[in-house]
């Protein structure tokens, strides 16, 4: 089976990242934590990864970007950069939940179907973005829908 060749970026948080999965199965990556400047960083990161792997954008099978949740400006940067690059190279685009991507990397997926992984990310202003995900063998990471009561009682500000 052919190894999928993908470029993925995420600018939805303070972490600005790009990763390239190339034919050799090796992952080439760049990662910088900064409050601002993602738009200035992401394009050079992409160019560096392609040069490092010795390939061109049109050699890839597709592109992916972190669709959040996250800051509005960061989400627009990732979506705009990937859509622009994909259009120019004739590639398909896959939006990926940033929370689901973290859940997928949990050290040891739960073995019981009723258990899951909770992922939280700082949304600033004393709030968090969060998602609860379940793992089923041979299936993608699936979000769990919880009733408001399961999360906790409403609190007065």
Report each predicted region and the residues it spans:
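N-terminal beta-alpha supersecondary unit
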Residues: 1-67
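Surface "functional belts" at beta-alpha junctions
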Residues: 2-4, 92-157
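Short glycine-rich anion-binding loops that position phosphate/pyrophosphate groups of nucleotides
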Residues: 14, 68-69, 123-126
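A glycine- and small-aliphatic-rich helix-loop capping segment at beta-alpha/alpha-beta transitions
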Residues: 23-26, 80-89, 135-138
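Short amphipathic alpha-helical face segments that pack within enzyme cores
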Residues: 41-44, 80, 101
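Short glycine/serine- and small hydrophobic-enriched flexible loop segments
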Residues: 47-48, 87, 107-108
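Phosphate-handling active-site elements
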Residues: 52-58, 86-96, 111-112
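DPxDG-like acidic metal-binding loop motif
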Residues: 64-98
């Amino acid at each position: 089976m052919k190894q999928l060749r993908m470029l993925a970026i995420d600018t939805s948080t303070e972490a600005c990242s790009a990763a390239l999965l190339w034919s050799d199965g090796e992952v080439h990556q760049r990662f910088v934590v900064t409050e601002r400047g993602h738009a200035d960083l992401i394009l050079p990161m992409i160019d560096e990864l392609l040069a490092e792997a010795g390939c061109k954008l049109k050699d890839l099978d597709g592109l992916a970007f972190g669709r959040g949740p996250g800051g509005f400006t960061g989400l627009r940067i990732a979506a705009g950069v990937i859509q622009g690059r994909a259009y120019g190279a004739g590639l398909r685009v896959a939006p990926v939940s940033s929370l689901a991507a973290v859940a997928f990397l949990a050290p040891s997926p739960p073995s019981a179907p009723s258990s899951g992984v909770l992922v939280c990310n700082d949304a600033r202003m004393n709030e968090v973005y969060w998602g609860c995900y379940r793992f089923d063998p041979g299936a993608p990471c699936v979000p769990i829908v919880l009733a408001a009561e399961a999360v906790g009682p409403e609190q007065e500000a």
